[in-house]
């Protein structure tokens, strides 16, 4: 029964997350709230999905939105670089292309970390980004696991129309919350190393 209850919680959480992302600009705050709730679920804490989601959404709205806009600008910039570089066929540009892929992987890793960081720790936006960079490299095995999962999802989206449709359907039911829950299992292990003894510094 507990397993079934958790499945229903993840479905409910997924629907709330999708609803909260509709304005698009709110995706950052919604992602931080999603991470906040799934980490609580992993730890067996406060089970109130609706209340906890909107609590975190409100608390991290400004910070989450700022980081979300920043991340969009970063990936637009990287996309433009790829567009320019892919039109060149020299060896130099081939090397630059490889380096650019490395930058993309690092940027993606940082943004996988930063929303959970702001949802769990009280810190400035700059410090949150610094912490995300530090954790990206400081916990490389966990980072690689998250990148593989993210890469697999992106691959399925690009593989064929059928697999893309499958990803869309699953995402609409429970995909976002399930992936966030899996990531939160990893974040639980990571964050415990940085949590202060005093609860005042943790949301």
Located regions from the model:
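Helix-coil boundary and N-terminal low-complexity module in membrane systems
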Residues: 1-100, 107-203
């Amino acid at each position: 029964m507990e397993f079934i209850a958790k499945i229903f919680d993840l479905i409910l959480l997924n629907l709330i997350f999708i609803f909260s992302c509709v304005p698009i600009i709110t995706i950052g705050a919604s992602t931080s709230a999603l991470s906040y709730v799934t980490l609580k679920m992993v730890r067996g804490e406060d089970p109130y999905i609706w209340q906890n989601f909107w609590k975190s959404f409100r608390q991290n709205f400004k910070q989450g939105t700022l980081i979300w806009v920043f991340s969009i600008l970063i990936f637009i910039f990287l996309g433009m670089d790829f567009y320019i570089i892919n039109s060149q066929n020299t060896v130099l540009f081939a090397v630059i292309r490889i380096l650019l892929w490395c930058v993309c992987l690092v940027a993606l890793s940082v943004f996988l970390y930063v929303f959970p960081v702001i949802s769990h720790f009280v810190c400035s936006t700059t410090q949150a980004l610094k912490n995300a960079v530090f954790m990206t490299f400081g916990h490389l095995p966990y980072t690689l696991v998250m990148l593989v999962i993210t890469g697999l999802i992106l691959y399925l989206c690009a593989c064929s129309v059928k697999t893309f449709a499958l990803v869309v359907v699953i995402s609409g039911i429970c995909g976002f919350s399930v992936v966030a829950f899996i990531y939160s299992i990893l974040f639980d292990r990571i964050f415990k190393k940085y949590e202060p003894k005093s609860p005042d510094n943790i949301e």
